[in-house]
């Protein structure tokens, strides 16, 4: 998978909630550390579910991270001696994240991003589709549908144990109290045309 002769490329890890995106990002970062490469991890300030300064997977794996408010703030922390730049919850970053990732890869960094490819309505989420289009590698993970057990590619938002309506706010940071993985057929969004 990583037989590139030139330094600098983009990897996207995407999928529904509970599919293991953060876990996979952490795994890749740890592998770079075993290889004696310098890595730095970023997360959006909005993601404070489990920790302010760590990327934490739903199963408890974690790695230190720098929380940033804006995409271009990433440049303040990147130094020439680094090899790998990892960014979790990339869907929460502003539209500049695509340009930032491109610049970093063009400067020779291996850039690994992880995020939701669809919002709770089943529509493309934030800048993730653009990042998938420019990436050298895309890994799409699936969870297990909480209703029928099939592979889950969607994230169901629940409000009082009922599916959220199509016109509810797109961003609501949460975990299992607000979301569960669903397959195409068990995913429900009231007032959305099928």
Curated annotation (Swiss-Prot):
It holds the Pfam family TK. Zn(2+) binds at residues 145, 148, 183, 186. The keyword Cytoplasm applies. It is found in: Cytoplasm. It is an enzyme of class 2 (transferase). GO terms for biological process: DNA biosynthetic process; thymidine metabolic process. PANTHER family: THYMIDINE KINASE, THYMIDINE KINASE, CYTOSOLIC. This is Thymidine kinase.
């Amino acid at each position: 998978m990583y037989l590139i002769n030139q330094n600098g490329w983009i990897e996207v890890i995407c999928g529904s909630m509970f599919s293991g995106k953060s876990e996979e990002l952490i795994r890749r970062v740890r592998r770079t550390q075993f290889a004696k490469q310098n890595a730095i991890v970023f997360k959006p300030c909005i993601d404070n579910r489990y920790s302010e300064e760590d990327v934490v997977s739903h199963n408890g794996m974690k790695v230190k991270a720098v929380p940033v408010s804006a995409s271009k703030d990433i440049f303040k922390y990147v130094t020439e001696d680094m090899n790998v730049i990892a960014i979790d919850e990339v869907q929460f970053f502003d539209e500049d994240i695509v340009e930032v990732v491109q610049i970093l890869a063009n400067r020779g960094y291996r850039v690994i991003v992880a995020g939701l490819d669809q919002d709770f309505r089943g529509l493309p989420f934030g800048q993730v589709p653009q990042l998938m289009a420019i990436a050298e590698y895309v890994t799409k993970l699936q969870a297990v549908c909480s209703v029928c057990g099939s592979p889950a590619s969607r994230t169901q938002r629940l409000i009082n144990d009922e599916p959220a309506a199509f016109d509810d706010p797109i961003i609501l940071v949460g975990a299992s109290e607000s979301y569960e993985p669903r397959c195409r057929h068990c995913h429900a969004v009231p007032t959305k045309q099928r």
